[in-house]
Amino acid sequence: MKNLKIAVAFLPLIASSPAVAATVSDPVGDFIPSFTGTASPDLDVTSFSVSLDQSATMFALGAVLAGDIDPSLAGFYVIGVNTGSGTARPFGAIGEPNVTFNQVIVVQKNGTATLGANTLTTLLSGNQFIVSVPVSLLPSTGTTPVNYGFNIWPRFGSTVTGNAQISDFAPDNALLGANGLLPVPEPATWLMMLLGFGLIGGMIRFGRDSTKAAIAQIA
């Protein structure tokens, strides 16, 4: 019944704009070794989905957890977004170097979700939630929306205090796009990307550094 309620609520969006979509499954109980928080089922991702409508104006991001989401237990969910220039990769030390991003969505257990200063529409029921994200809030930095990459990681606690708070990643050490898992760039590709960014870096460095600092506080 809970699953049906969420599906029905999003039916107008899906019916009016056929989408490309992809889902990745994640094993139950695969808390990462570096996690030091309380291993509650609602911090264990079992599937993550990315859907983009036909007009490429709206993403629907969905997550299913191993247990009902309990607001009385400390924790929240972070979704990293790579819109093309996502060179932030802070999780190499905990075995997730390919989780790269340049935007962050935060979903609280009470159903509120934010992207920067913007509040997003969220449906939360039982052990799952869906967040609706306008593409206009995720401007491209080098690729098309259908090729944007996403990853979700739950955090224990109420604020970001370090990587030991992170319980799980979905997908593991990868990014999910609307067409499926995204390939990991070869080292030479990364080098060319970084050189290209360096050519325009002097023009946008202040804004970029400010964005990185802001992301570091919430991711």
Regions from the PLM with identified roles:
Residues L65, V135-L137, L195:
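A mature extracytoplasmic/lumenal domain signature
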Residues A56-M58, A74-F76, A117-T121, G126-I130, ...:
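Extracellular structured ligand-interaction cores
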Residues T100-P139:
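Structured beta-strand segments within beta-sheet-rich domains
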Residues G126-F169:
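Ser/Thr/Pro-rich, low-complexity mucin-like regions
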Residues G201-A219:
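C-terminal membrane-anchoring or membrane-association module
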Residues V20-F76, G80-T112, F156-L182:
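Order/disorder boundary and secretion-linked terminal/linker segments
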Residues L4-T23, G177-L199:
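Short, threonine-centered small-residue motifs that mark membrane-proximal processing/anchoring sites
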